[in-house]
């Protein structure tokens, strides 16, 4: 399902296996638990890198599980359950006292892309993988915190339109040009992870206060943090 490995200052969160890494409630609970574990073990210089195995980073919520509820009402209730249980995952990433990097090994769609965008940096492969917000194609409305995250993280209305209102599957080079990801210069799953580790080690060497880092991060996204119920606290740990 997913694992957390500590390599010195780096925490590596991996969605394991060769499937689509759909977010079933059990998967969501496990991810949240691992983020809480990383937070509890964090020190100055800690970094989180999130990646996955196989063709997909994540293809979003487990819609097949929702549809097995046996009725439209049951399916809607299960979808609502996943939307609400995923909200604390986004909040946990914004509140995490360390820099965060998403290393996209493959396709990131819907809630899978939201997971990626919840990180400070997003790296993508150039040879494989698309970004895709499928809601307009499959007839689902956008949760408020999804929309707020996209507004917070993607700077131009043109880029947001391409991502949310066109149903377009965006490849790496275009995603960089639109300002959705930071880099897409890697030819393999290993390559994108290595690049993320390299950045992580560079950031870890700064030995920043994680609490200050998280406070500054949250101050950048007041609307999103308000929706997520996050408060920004002021920390004073100056290096004199």
UniProtKB/Swiss-Prot annotation:
Cite the EC number: 5.3.3.8
Keyword Isomerase recorded: yes
GO terms for CC? peroxisome
Q: Which InterPro entries match?
A: ClpP/crotonase-like_dom_sf, Enoyl-CoA_hydra/iso
Recorded metabolic or biological pathway in which this protein acts: Lipid metabolism; fatty acid beta-oxidation
Gene inactivation phenotype reads: Defective in root hair expansion. Mutant plants are resistant to the inhibitory effect of intermediate levels of indole-3-butyric acid (IBA) and 2,4-DB on root elongation.
List, alphabetically, the SUPFAM superfamilies matched.
ClpP/crotonase
Q: Where does it primarily localize?
A: other
Give one GO term, molecular function aspect: delta(3)-delta(2)-enoyl-CoA isomerase activity
Q: Where does the motif Microbody targeting signal lie?
A: 238-240
Subcellular localization, as worded in the UniProt entry = Peroxisome
Instruction: Name the CDD domains for this protein.
Output: crotonase-like
Q: Which reaction does it catalyse?
A: a (3Z)-enoyl-CoA = a 4-saturated (2E)-enoyl-CoA; a (3E)-enoyl-CoA = a 4-saturated (2E)-enoyl-CoA
GO BP: any one term: indolebutyric acid metabolic process
The entry sums up its family as follows: Belongs to the enoyl-CoA hydratase/isomerase family.
Q: What does this protein do?
A: Able to isomerize both 3-cis and 3-trans double bonds into the 2-trans form in a range of enoyl-CoA species. Essential for the beta oxidation of unsaturated fatty acids. Involved with IBR1 and IBR3 in the peroxisomal beta-oxidation of indole-3-butyric acid (IBA) to form indole-3-acetic acid (IAA), a biologically active auxin.
Write down what this protein is called: Enoyl-CoA delta isomerase 2, peroxisomal
């Amino acid at each position: 399902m997913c694992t957390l490995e500590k390599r010195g200052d780096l925490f590596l969160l991996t969605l394991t296996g060769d499937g689509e890494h759909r977010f079933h409630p059990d998967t969501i609970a496990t991810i949240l638990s691992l983020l809480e574990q990383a937070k509890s073990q964090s020190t100055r210089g800690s970094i989180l890198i999130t990646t996955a195995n196989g063709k997909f980073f994540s293809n979003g919520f487990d819609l097949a599980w929702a549809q097995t509820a046996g009725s439209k009402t049951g399916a809607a209730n299960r979808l609502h359950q996943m939307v609400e249980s995923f909200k604390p995952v986004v909040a946990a990433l914004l509140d995490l006292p360390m820099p965060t990097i998403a290393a996209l090994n493959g396709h990131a769609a819907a809630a899978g892309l939201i997971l990626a965008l919840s990180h400070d940096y997003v790296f993508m492969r150039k040879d494989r993988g698309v970004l895709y917000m499928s809601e307009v194609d499959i007839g689902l409305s956008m949760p408020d915190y999804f929309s707020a995250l996209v507004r917070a993280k993607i700077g131009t209305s043109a880029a947001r339109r391409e991502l949310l209102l066109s149903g377009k599957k965006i490849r790496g080079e275009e995603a960089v040009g639109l300002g959705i990801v930071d880099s897409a210069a890697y030819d393999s799953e290993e390559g994108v992870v290595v690049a993320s580790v390299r950045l992580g080690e560079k950031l870890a060497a700064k030995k920043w206060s994680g609490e200050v880092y998280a406070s500054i991060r949250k101050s950048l996204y007041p609307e999103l943090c308000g929706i997520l119920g996050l408060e920004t606290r002021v920390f004073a740990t100056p290096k004199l």
